[in-house]
Amino acid sequence: MDLEHQTMETFLRWAAEIGISDSIDSSRFRDSCLGHSLSVSDFPDAGGRGLGAARELKKGELVLKVPRKALMTTESIIAKDLKLSDAVNLHNSLSSTQILSVCLLYEMSKEKKSFWYPYLFHIPRDYDLLATFGNFEKQALQVEDAVWATEKATAKCQSEWKEAGSLMKELELKPKFRSFQAWLWASATISSRTLHVPWDSAGCLCPVGDLFNYDAPGDYSNTPQGPESANNVEEAGLVVETHSERLTDGGFEEDVNAYCLYARRNYQLGEQVLLCYGTYTNLELLEHYGFMLEENSNDKVFIPLETSLFSLASSWPKDSLYIHQDGKLSFALISTLRLWLIPQSQRDKSVMRLVYAGSQISVKNEILVMKWMSEKCGSVLRDLPTSVTEDTVLLHNIDKLQDPELRLEQKETEAFGSEVRAFLDANCLWDVTVLSGKPIEFSRKTSRMLSKWRWSVQWRLSYKRTLADCISYCNEKMNNLLGTQDRLRDL
């Protein structure tokens, strides 16, 4: 039995001892909290380590119950430590998330003396959230909105770390637990792993409950993406947004004083059991959870729009003007464009009624809308440093770098603006990789940078594919409309 398997068994035994169970009958002590409904399994092509069905499961069936005493919250942590409680009470200006971050670092500093040690041992030590991106990975996103979101996330993390500094000093945490890197880890842990609880806006860390991989809302065919360290709910906390979602996913239930998680659909024996924790675009998934989906029906692509267009869109929120992942325009965007491309003198009540109903104003106007949108998307694509084809090849080359059995040819490292070479140069690996003629093993730091760089390229490729799909959609619709116009003229 390998060390990883042994430590997992120890963790599941500890979880059973504190009342966590995948069985309705949790009164009987077992060596593991799992085995009745769930089992820890490996899903190499669907998120890595996750939870599989130990039997046939029905939609809405309880699959895991975690008592309140087992949840890791600010309340449960300070209840076990008077020194921590007294210090926290003197810092009311800190947010609940900052307090939980400090509490997490405080517990980590105790190491094996912490009550939570069996659980903390299994928390990943690295994350791929936007706030953890270095300058190279940030610039690799290419799109201004994504670069700005990364800078904003990093600045927010730095500001919160500085604000919490005095509390961490009062607790006499060792320098390594007070460092920005430690804070970045704690902040990422809480952002990506916490579950919603009604009594604390920071949420809670839920042992075993964070082993589930992610399923997009209302999409049971969606396959989880990325490595285990990047997309299971170990790194992506469950957020329950509606009562109906709670019934098929999970939530804290006062009547049983426990967090209860449910099967969101029927599962066969051995099939991976997934949970949904909200509706997010791919950029939001990267920002808050450190992964994205290859196919995400909730993704949105925003492009630069004229100021005069926004003034006409006052009836809709600014973030409703977007392109769906399949290339189609959102209701608000196409409605606004229809109005914007009509001369102001023709914007009478009948036109406005058509606009707000989401109806086509005229064939001529619709052709103008499709032509303008196609040209706009083409302009955005041309302004970006690399193309869809180039990014597709680059992703393949990054995969080669990640595989110790493969080696890039020199021509591959010099292609497409030398982005691969820039990565190797940044890690002092250019000469080693190209001249040695042998595969090399990257350091942990370089491997983490490589992983984040891959997410950046994958995200920008998805962005560009959506724009390309939008061009195809608009051109096809425009051609159909022109054909209709010609047929009407011939009548």
Curated annotation (Swiss-Prot):
The keyword NADP does not apply. It comes from the Eukaryota. Keywords: Methyltransferase, S-adenosyl-L-methionine, Transferase. The gene is SDG40. GO terms for biological process: methylation. One of its GO terms (molecular function) is methyltransferase activity. InterPro entries: Rubisco_LSMT_subst-bd_sf, SET_dom, SET_dom_sf, SETD3_SETD6_MTase. Pfam families: SET (PF00856). It comes from Arabidopsis thaliana. This is Protein SET DOMAIN GROUP 40. Its EC number is 2.1.1.-. The keyword Repeat does not apply. Belongs to the class V-like SAM-binding methyltransferase superfamily.
